[in-house]
Amino acid sequence: MRSSCVLLAALLALVAYYVYIPLPSAVSDPWKLMLLDATFRGAQQVSNLIHSLGLSHHLITLNFIIISFGKKSARSSPRVKVTDTDFDGVEVRVFEGPPKPDEPLRRSVVYIHGGGWALASAKISYYDQLCTAMAEELNAVIVSIEYRLVPQVYFPEQIHDVIRATKYFLQPEVLDKYKVDPGRVGVSGDSAGGNLAAALGQQFTYVESLKNKLKLQALIYPVLQALDFNTPSYQQSMNTPILPRHVMVRYWVDYFKGNYDFVEAMIVNNHTSLDVERAAALRARLDWTSLLPSSIKKNYKPVLQTIGDARIVKEIPQLLDAAASPLIAEQEVLQALPKTYILTCEHDVLRDDGIMYAKRLESAGVNVTLDHFEDGFHGCMIFTSWPTNFSVGIRTRDSYFKWLDQNL
């Protein structure tokens, strides 16, 4: 009996050691976040082990784990019709909310899920629940795009998928089929989905027939640039779950089918050092010393290497492509974008990407709402139901829905 108690105590101590990580005191539901992070870290470690044994790509394994625990079939409710179909060969899940009695045509949101361009699905419970609630509360049609993921495809194929599906949906006969008002269609996404939504919005500005098709864009803690991994938020939250800095950099490398040997050099900005001429012209477009307010900059210092590794952008030129990093787009492109909502979280490496994009859009004359949550962390908006229900998740979702309701 005594030996069993000792063994149990030892096991509990090991579990506590694995689960516990220091977190900012202001973050929402810290112990719940630790448990969520430990679960995700465990899945990542299993996936990396399987990868190292040569059995499967780590992202395929990790996504299999994620989807196995949460995939939902298309199931309608009394107020929301849910169907799986495809738009021009791209899988989508469509959520049809009830029309308002005085409005025969409904508004619509094209939604793009997050997951580092490699994980998750429009069909997992988190996004199914989000889009169902959005369709019901906004009396809207939500088109959630099931774009192809890394390592099945790499940049820019994810962008091509969301553009193809959205262009198909915007055809008059398709909008008519779903009883959607063509003047009330927006695009939205979270994290990597926010990146794709921003890229889609910018790509539409190049095509005259698509230029004014979107009424708004709503970007939820979007990832918007791959040039500077030492913004104040990257420095402040480098080890904060559920998106530590090294994980975000690896997602970028995976997206571009790059070499993992470059990750450590990229973390210290060796890929955009002063001797990398191609990066020089773009650096001013994300100069956080001028784009961020002093309350965000605090005492953080820019990390700009004099001599870096020019091989990185030579082998991964996509790092400097505005289609991948919407924050570095030219002013003329930004000027043509619609009304924008950007949600950012204090405890998120991507916080400053969103704040800088809001500033650049404002400077270009775009109507922007920046919605910042001091106790938020990356990914929080989809965590609204037990056992991963966070108070900040519910508040961010409600704030997002409210803005859409008032502006779409």
Swiss-Prot record:
The UniProt catalytic activity note for this protein reads: a 1-O-alkyl-2-acetyl-sn-glycerol + H2O = a 1-O-alkyl-sn-glycerol + acetate + H(+); 1-O-hexadecyl-2-acetyl-sn-glycerol + H2O = 1-O-hexadecyl-sn-glycerol + acetate + H(+); a cholesterol ester + H2O = cholesterol + a fatty acid + H(+); cholesteryl (9Z-octadecenoate) + H2O = cholesterol + (9Z)-octadecenoate + H(+)
Top-rank EC class of the record's enzyme? hydrolase
Name the catalytic site residues.
S191, D348, H378
Major localisation = membrane
Gene Ontology cellular component terms for the protein in this record: endoplasmic reticulum; membrane; plasma membrane
Question: Subcellular location, in the record's words?
Answer: Cell membrane; Microsome
Q: How is it modified after translation?
A: N-glycosylated.
Q: Some GO term, biological process aspect, for this entry: which one?
A: ether lipid metabolic process
State the Gene Ontology terms under molecular function.
Answer: acetylalkylglycerol acetylhydrolase activity; phosphate ion binding; serine hydrolase activity
The UniProt entry annotates the motif Involved in the stabilization of the negatively charged intermediate by the formation of the oxyanion hole at 113-115
Listed A to Z, the keywords are: Cell membrane, Endoplasmic reticulum, Glycoprotein, Hydrolase, Lipid degradation, Lipid metabolism, Membrane, Microsome, Signal-anchor, Transmembrane, Transmembrane helix
Its record classes its membrane topology as:
Single-pass type II membrane protein
InterPro entries documented for this protein: AB_hydrolase_3, AB_hydrolase_fold, Arylacetamide_deacetylase, GDXG_lipolytic_enzyme, Lipase_GDXG_put_SER_AS
Kindly name one Pfam family recorded for this protein: Abhydrolase_3
| Stated family | Belongs to the 'GDXG' lipolytic enzyme family.
Protein purpose:
Hydrolyzes 2-acetyl monoalkylglycerol ether (1-O-alkyl-2-acetyl-sn-glycerol), the penultimate precursor of the pathway for de novo synthesis of platelet-activating factor. May be responsible for the hydrolysis of cholesterol esters (such as cholesteryl (9Z-octadecenoate)) in macrophages. Also involved in organ detoxification by hydrolyzing exogenous organophosphorus compounds.
Full protein name: Neutral cholesterol ester hydrolase 1
Biological classification of the source: Eukaryota, Metazoa, Chordata, Craniata, Vertebrata
